[in-house]
Amino acid sequence: MVDEDKKSGTRVFKKTSPNGKITTYLGKRDFIDRGDYVDLIDGMVLIDEEYIKDNRKVTAHLLAAFRYGREDLDVLGLTFRKDLISETFQVYPQTDKSISRPLSRLQERLKRKLGANAFPFWFEVAPKSASSVTLQPAPGDTGKPCGVDYELKTFVAVTDGSSGEKPKKSALSNTVRLAIRKLTYAPFESRPQPMVDVSKYFMMSSGLLHMEVSLDKEMYYHGESISVNVHIQNNSNKTVKKLKIYIIQVADICLFTTASYSCEVARIESNEGFPVGPGGTLSKVFAVCPLLSNNKDKRGLALDGQLKHEDTNLASSTILDSKTSKESLGIVVQYRVKVRAVLGPLNGELFAELPFTLTHSKPPESPERTDRGLPSIEATNGSEPVDIDLIQLHEELEPRYDDDLIFEDFARMRLHGNDSEDQPSPSANLPPSLL
């Protein structure tokens, strides 16, 4: 039945203020950073006729914030939050700029459907800016998790003439909060195949222990197995007993100083073909796949969303740009393959490390971007990933324009056993290690 609904109409997400006076409509909840541009954040706000007659001011506000401390510690004007992006748009009364700007296709359809009291808004986010990242709390932790997240808020301005103040309780009934996500897609680039050679010298041994490690490519998609090619040449008088391969996620917390947190997201140990004695060789390919389903209890793990949501993956690799400072990103995520050749307690280990990129498969081109005739993204490398990417980017786009609009509540699907109440953003609760 779900598939039939998707074929027969275009999904539109909506959320209404507690007093029912304003309703916000969005075509999708996830917006993709494609390297040269970010999907346009465009929607409509339906305003009650009473507010139209009273000429009440309605504003949309986009906020990307990095919460690195608990909200109950916010005292004396000192908050444990850093605002990375903050933009406002006056929805009503309309400005000359908003009146002259052409509507997107979805906005045109919503305007026809909702009537004259629906008004548009737009936000354009700079490419390679901060993306949504949540640091997973420990089991049993309460409150909101630490991380970088985006909030789209539409509200009716207070009438006491104050400005720049936090909305009063009386105004919260006139406010709609939507927790959206900005995700990263890394366009395919012809990059060299990752490879490293390492050697170890031993006392009382004339030869070296040599190990060569390589990956079949530099970029992988969520749910795709990583092929690790290992070649060992033992010219020493020592014996290699076994091999350990790890996938490590490194999250750099970029504040006043940079702190790094490492999480092991996949691991295999192999005794096949071992031991490799003096003069011996071993060549073998190992397949390892990092998945969130195997790491749900690890505190501090960086995710694309929140664990209680069904459509959440491990955080994608951050695409760094020489013109972008790490401090403006909040959290920088990277991945590495680490290989350890174990020789024994007295002889130590020989290890090698290779970085790689973990990202989403290529999403469809944004319809509005295509209409403007802007260049498309390079094709991917053609590799077919395993279908375990839980964030289905193609479902969030506007597929057709001759079908019906299907309105859905904005709240995301939750895993069984989690609270179904939609949580506002930005996130708040911080692992104690960051305090």
Curated annotation (Swiss-Prot):
Q: Where is this motif: Clathrin box?
A: 390-394
Which portions of the chain have biased composition (kind: Low complexity)? Answer: 424-435
- Please give the knockout or disruption phenotype noted for this protein: No effect on the response to the aversive chemical stimulus octanol or to volatile attractants. Behavioral adaptation to prolonged exposure to isoamyl alcohol or benzaldehyde is impaired. Recovery of chemotaxis from odorant-induced adaptation is impaired. Moderate reduction in chemotaxis towards volatile attractant diacetyl but not towards isoamyl alcohol and benzaldehyde. Slight defect in egg-laying. Increased lifespan and nuclear localization of daf-16. Reduced lifespan in a daf-16 (mu86) mutant background or in a mpz-1 RNAi-mediated knockdown background.
Tissue expression as described in the entry: Expressed in head neurons, nerve ring and ventral nerve cord (at protein level). Expressed in the nervous system including the nerve ring and the ventral and dorsal nerve cords. Highly expressed in amphid chemosensory neurons AWA, AWB, AWC, ADL and ASH, and in hermaphrodite specific neuron HSN. Also expressed in the intestine.
Q: Which residue ranges does the record annotate as region Disordered? A: 358-382, 416-435
- Does Phosphoprotein count among this protein's keywords? no
Extract the signal peptide range.
none
Pfam families, alphabetically?
Arrestin_C, Arrestin_N
Q: Which UniProt keywords apply?
A: Cell projection, Sensory transduction
The keyword Repressor is annotated on this UniProt entry = no
**UniProt xrefs under InterPro entries:** Arrestin, Arrestin-like_C, Arrestin-like_N, Arrestin_C-like, Arrestin_CS, Arrestin_N, Ig_E-set
Location in the cell: Perikaryon; Cell projection, Dendrite
Subunit description: Component of a complex composed of arr-1, daf-18 and mpz-1. Within the complex, interacts (via C-terminus) with mpz-1 (via PDZ domain) and phosphatase daf-18. May interact (via C-terminus) with clathrin chc-1 and beta-2 adaptin (AP2) apb-1.
Q: Which family does it belong to?
A: Belongs to the arrestin family.
What PANTHER family does this protein map onto?
ARRESTIN, KURTZ ARRESTIN
What's the protein name? Beta-arrestin arr-1
Organism of derivation: Caenorhabditis elegans
Instruction: List the lineage, top down.
Output: Eukaryota, Metazoa, Ecdysozoa, Nematoda, Chromadorea
